[in-house]
């Protein structure tokens, strides 16, 4: 199971705190992150992050590509709802891909905590079943 971690600039500290708090759970999974977010997490934790490009430089689109190829099973995208983003269309495309491919996406800390606790309890294992069935078709 692979998790994508993305955070807008004003939410990076929150993402780092989240990763520190749930490091024992997150370390069990493959982790992908946009460039700056991934660096910040790696600087503050022992987590191994597959870093992609920075969000505005195509990182969101790279995560979208991983969603299409069923390599991402959960997206935690801590968005800043109070600041306009220059790459808003990329963000909307990423959210749309999560909807199309049935990938759970958390866009705030509350939903991120719900998903990470569900993941720890094995409640997202349906993703693995779904992937194995689609590979047989």
Curated annotation (Swiss-Prot):
GO annotation terms (biological process): methylglyoxal biosynthetic process
Gene Ontology CC terms: cytosol
PROSITE patterns assigned to the protein according to its UniProt record, in alphabetical order: METHYLGLYOXAL_SYNTH (PS01335), MGS (PS51855)
Keywords carried by this UniProt record: Lyase
Enzyme Commission number(s): 4.2.3.3
Active site (catalytic residues): 60 (proton donor/acceptor)
Cysteine disulfide partners in this protein: none
CDD domains cross-referenced by the UniProt entry: MGS
Gene Ontology MF, one: methylglyoxal synthase activity
Chemical reaction(s) catalysed: dihydroxyacetone phosphate = methylglyoxal + phosphate
Ligand binding (substrate): 8, 12, 34-37, 54-55, 87
Domain of life: Bacteria
Entry similarity comment: Belongs to the methylglyoxal synthase family.
Protein name in UniProt: Methylglyoxal synthase
